[in-house]
Amino acid sequence: MALKESQAELKLAADVVSTKIARAEAEDKLYGMKSIVFMQGWMPAEKEPELADIFDKYECAWETEDPDPSEYPDVPVKLKNNKLTNGLNMVTEMYSLPAYDGVDPNPLMAPFFILFYGLMMADMGYGLVMIAAALVAMKKIKPREGTLTFCQLLLWGGISTFIMGALTGGFFGDALVQIGGILGMPEGWGTLPCLFNPLDDAIYVLVGSMVLGLIHLNTGMVINVVQRVKRGDIAGAIWEEGALWVTMVGIVLFVLKIGNVAGVPVVLVIGCVMVLFGGTRSAKGFGKLTSIFGTLYNTLTGWFGDILSYSRIMALMLAGSVIAQVFNTIGAIANNLVVFFIIFLIGHALNFALNLLGCYVHDLRLQCLEYFGKFYKDGGRAFAPLRIKTKYYDTVEQ
């Protein structure tokens, strides 16, 4: 009981001690003598005017300069976010922060991550639960830092899940249809309009997933080309990404029987030659021969495997829908609303929890392995400035 009564004081003491520890650790990094103190560190470039205002209050000498390329591995990274991308910090930090000379992946990943999550979950009821949980948590708990990013990600995932559920006609599976059957409503009561049904249109959903995968992967390649051009590696962009694009166009033309000369798919042949040459540019002697086979194998199996990975979007959408309908059907067997809602609550709580985690893990895999593999340079370390960092209390400047 005594500990419970002193909980507020203990929390305040914990915040005070953690702040003092951070300050002491920072002081250990200072260089100085009796009358001189020397400090060196990193700061975001846009914060320089604020730094100038602070230093101008004191009689001290200071200067700032951009880091030299040789210093890039040591420069900390601070991601720039908005309300849409802040939740993706959770994903990026779980994988690895970008290198200083890399690109911020959050704005490039956000549309795809949110879209894919909604497609895999695809249920209006589950989406509403996620939205409500996120809004209540942000309103009542006032989360900060990691908890806040989780709530923001949950909110965007819930919005996407609701929209995709509206397109597939899912509201806790077919719960309304089963309730209508128990109440003796006419056949078809409770059936929601939909653009497509994952159970009836599984092939179309699978093809659509593959197309989204192609768009996703090619977006990553475009980002990599932009980075190559900025670095002056135009040849690399032509012989790697460019060669693959020519090959893709050649495959499409070959299937459509367009552009063949004397029965030979010219564009496809040119693309294949470019891929082979690009893969063997750096090899010498006998290594060129082995590189040819390695390039063919890696290109064919790599791209086939990458695109096939996106079939998980269809698989998770289908699995979640089927499990939801199974629990609804079991609950409706007794033809009693009380029994139905008991089984409904237990079954959907289990299905919701499994899908909430499963969709996140599989979406994470598509972003980190497939998408990031096309352009992402990781290895950055987080920018950690000296500041009052509390866990239980907010600080107010007076």
Model-derived features: positions:
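Intrinsically disordered, flexible peripheral segments
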Residues: 1-83
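Conserved, carboxylate-rich catalytic/transport cores that coordinate ions
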Residues: 49-398
